[in-house]
């Protein structure tokens, strides 16, 4: 493998950091913006070069499908329960019985998910999370600004981006057709877990 240029090394670090911080890889548009490229085609050329160098792969037909490659000789399969639905729209009531169990490649996820939820709605489409997707959830009652979380608000469950504003929490949709959900201190609210990847059934 040839030595990476400083620019491509920086792009690889950007991808790795974004996956670690937000649970998903950046889009070509986000890479272009971060590095000041004039168009997405420039970012695409760098992604192709990193792919040819064996450092990443791009999963076809999968949203934000850049995956970091490692030296493991064979995939590690995880057995993950599917626990019903999560709203990408208005929150919905909990439906957390085990529906089925799937065996999925560990490399699909940025961290090992404790369970999967099926997305209902389209409020997260700009983050590449579509109606019908299965999202991996890593149980964690805490999350940082900008992370995608599965949260329970007044007994109902939703998936949104988390943002702190003063003593309020905002659950941000990623579709301009939806309004943010503002969580006040008097409401019954808990973060159930952090998004760590998705599976899309074609």
Swiss-Prot record:
Alphabetical GO biological process terms: DNA repair; DNA replication; negative regulation of DNA-templated transcription; proteolysis; SOS response
Which keywords belong to this entry? Answer: Autocatalytic cleavage, DNA damage, DNA repair, DNA replication, DNA-binding, Hydrolase, Repressor, SOS response, Transcription, Transcription regulation
Name the catalytic site residues. 123, 160
Q: What is its EC number?
A: 3.4.21.88
Looking at the UniProt record, the site noted as Cleavage sits at 88-89
MF-aspect GO terms: DNA binding; serine-type endopeptidase activity
The record lists the catalysed reaction(s) as:
Hydrolysis of Ala-|-Gly bond in repressor LexA
Residue ranges of DNA binding = 28-48
- EC main class here is hydrolase
Q: Which family does it belong to?
A: Belongs to the peptidase S24 family.
Q: What task does this protein carry out?
A: Represses a number of genes involved in the response to DNA damage (SOS response), including recA and lexA. In the presence of single-stranded DNA, RecA interacts with LexA causing an autocatalytic cleavage which disrupts the DNA-binding part of LexA, leading to derepression of the SOS regulon and eventually DNA repair.
- State how it assembles: Homodimer.
Q: What is this protein called?
A: LexA repressor 2
Q: Which organism is it from?
A: Pseudomonas syringae pv. tomato (strain ATCC BAA-871 / DC3000)
- In the UniProt record, the gene name given for this protein reads lexA2
